[in-house]
Amino acid sequence: ILKFADETKIFGRVRGHEDCLELQRDLDRLLGWAEEWQMAFNIKKCKVMRVGNNICTYEYKMRAHSLEEVQVEKDLGVLISSDLKVSPQCIGACARASRVLGMINRTIVNKTTEVMVQLYKTLVRPHLEYCSSAWSPHYQKDKELIERVQHRFSRMVPAVRADTYSVRLQKLNLWSLEERRNRADLIEVYTRTQLLLGWTDLFVTCK
């Protein structure tokens, strides 16, 4: 069981019908515990996601209410799919970023380099990088979809519009989004290894 703020997740490995029954019993115990402490789940918002290929079909319930089964669900702002592909998250992030970018293009009259870059960094790029270490894409089509947003932004800046994309990035002092994700992944690995092991213990483990 995992709990964060007002979100609760209960999960288990399912290899057959008995595992489904055990997970249902865990769900019943969780519901009983919540009621004992005078807390209530919003059952209409409770959902089931099955992850994997060999999936045992079972209708999970909370009291007499059958839980809705979903293929994609948002978890702490990130879209998770039952096949664990990150394409839905990439599409959603690009859609949000593109809406903001369109608003900037329509409303900003004086598109100086300094103003446009600051607006992009503040209002657009965070949509493309939120929690990216958890969903960094590995399919080329997803990488290109994300990069296309920054490509579109760079063409909105009059001072660099005539240049190629790589030259525009250099003049705007920007990295490609893939480079930034790779850098974020390296920082994440370094931070976690330092906190959990320390470099000395890590080298001993690798021997």
Regions found by a protein language model. Name each.
Residues 1-207:
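Hydrophobic/basic alpha-helical segments
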